[in-house]
Amino acid sequence: MTKLPKDAAEVLLFNTLTGLRPTEAVLSIQLIKREPEKYINKETGMLEHFRYPDLFIRKTKKAYITAFNEVILDVADKADTSSWMAIRSQLKRRGIESHLKYCRAIFATYLRKQGIESEVINIYQGRVPTSVFAAHYLKTNIQDDRNRILKAVGNFYE
C-alpha cells in the first residue's frame, strides 16, 4: 500500500473493511461524502445501500447494508472519489496490478475465520434475495451481527 497514492490506498482499505465490490465501494464513498444524512444510519451503525436501489440492488449483484464505525468513515473521508476505472488507470500507470475482488474475498474469509456465520456474511455481501435481506434486517438482532463484524474487522487496522 505504500506504493499507492494515499487516497487510492484508502479506497483499497475501505474496500477490504467493508467487503463491497470495487464499484460499490467507490459509490459508497461518494454517498458518505455527499449524502451522509440519508445514507449513514447512526442509530443502527449501518450504511444503508438499500436506500439507493438503482446503484446497489441490481439483478445479479446486490449490496444492502454495511456495518461502519468512525475508523471506516475516516477512511472513506480520506479516499479518492473518482470512479473505480479512474483509480484503476492511476494504479496501472504506476505499474501496480489491481485486483480489488481480492479485498472482498479477504473480508469474507477473515470474517469466517473469526467465527462469523456464512449466512451473516452472505447478507452483508448481498448474496441473498431481497426478501431474505428484509426478513433478516427486520427480525434479527442486527446490532449483534454489526458488533461482531466490526470487532473482527477491527483487527485489520489495529
Summary of predicted features, one role per range:
Residues 25, 98, 108, 115-127:
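Active-site-proximal segment of tyrosine recombinases
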Residues 60-112:
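Active-site/catalytic core of tyrosine-dependent DNA strand-transfer enzymes
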Residues 1-22, 104:
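Basic, Lys/Arg- and aromatic-enriched nucleic-acid-binding interface segment
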Residues 125-158:
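Catalytic-site neighborhood detector that most strongly recognizes the C-terminal catalytic loop/helix
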Residues 11, 87-88, 118:
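Generic structural marker for isolated residues within well-ordered, non-membrane alpha-helices
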Residues 18, 27-70:
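Conserved tyrosine-mediated DNA breakage-rejoining catalytic core shared by Y-recombinases
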Residues 11-12, 23-28, 121:
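Alpha-helix N-cap/helix-start motif at helix boundaries, enriched for small hydrophobics
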